[in-house]
Amino acid sequence: MKKIALTALAVFSLAASAAYADVVKVGVIGPFSGPFALQGKNFKAGIDAYMAEHGNKVGDDTVEVVYRDVPQADPAQSKALAQELVVKEGVQYLAGFYFTPDAMAVTPILKQGNVPMVVMNAATSSIVTKSPYVVRTSFTTWQTSTPIARVALDKGVKKVISVVSDYGPGVDAENAFKAAFTDAGGEVVEAIRMPLATNDFSPIMQRIKDSGAQGVFAFLPSGPTTLGFMKAYVDNGLKSSGIQLFAPGDLTQESDLPALGENALGVLTTFHYAVSHDSPENRKFVEEARKAIGNPAELSFPSVGAYDGMHVIYKMIEATGGKKDAAKAVEAVKGMEWVSPRGPVSIDPESRHITQNIYLREVAKADDGTYYNKEIQTFEKQGDPGLKAQ
């Protein structure tokens, strides 16, 4: 059955170029319903913002986006939807992928289907190693977790306990922080891995208090789990007792800040993007993306990965003249440089991963009473240290 499915992809890839010469379809897989629907909504806002700014045509070709919903991480469903998009819908590009397992599951069909994949969020370093047709426009957990170790040490914190969700990006975050922290003389006194479904964090908070650590490094996927963790951090007295919290920016994404409120004030994170980033490119992007998403408070980081993902896809379409040629499409964007809403970025010609600035941010309160991530330091031109650790 697997051989038949792959053969169908190969046969269809030959016919698709002729059948869809003037329409180039982009298949986007992400969570558009369920507990992570806001992340899918941000994918769509970023895509809509890009197309509002640049139109829906590349040369003589019209770009059409086809969406498929995977509410929670489901590798089997993601692979089935990707096959359906390539075989039945005739998409020439696959994109999106909020969850790492979903992106991993789709990589085996890329070569046979002659289709590139543009990862707009999924953050495990090794995704780009699974196929030469994968390009990433988001970030990796290694990329955003490494600088925060330096920040903790600069704050005088020498002993830290690590707490992460037990899945690919969580393990990456744990390893990234530990490598950078211990190499610089710090000590990770304990490393806790929590099941993804964890919703009672009180026992974890007690272990943190009992560990004797001066600080806690935390990584959880953005959404309901981060809200629960932050509430427990405050309610169990860790914040008031001076145990400092350090994390990559998933923990304080903008769409969660209204719910986190005072609990998040002063929390330090390192990340590739903040909605508050001060640049002409970002102000223009935020204006369009907020129109697209409807509720301005819901705009968050997946939107910029999607926006830049479409920028890369448009370049691929231009380079191939709208024809279906995954190898040529990917080759065209290796080494590509541009100024993104997040700052200067480029696609590494070897890894096909995005090189970008990582920003130290502190949750602050604006004059109008809203909360935002205030950028206070820049780590320039950060690649992905996780690829060297593979």
From Swiss-Prot:
Keywords: Amino-acid transport, Signal, Transport. InterPro entries: BCAA_transport, Leu-bd, Leu_Ile_Val-bd, Peripla_BP_I. It comes from the Bacteria. Residues 1-21 form the signal peptide. One of its GO terms (biological process) is amino acid transport. The keyword Signal applies. It holds the Pfam family Peripla_BP_6. CDD domains: PBP1_RPA0985_benzoate-like. Gene3D superfamilies: 3.40.50.2300. Belongs to the leucine-binding protein family. PANTHER family: LEUCINE-SPECIFIC-BINDING PROTEIN (PTHR30483), PERIPLASMIC BINDING PROTEIN OF ABC TRANSPORTER FOR NATURAL AMINO ACIDS (PTHR30483:SF6). Component of an amino-acid transport system. This is Leu/Ile/Val-binding protein homolog 6. It comes from Brucella melitensis biotype 1 (strain ATCC 23456 / CCUG 17765 / NCTC 10094 / 16M).
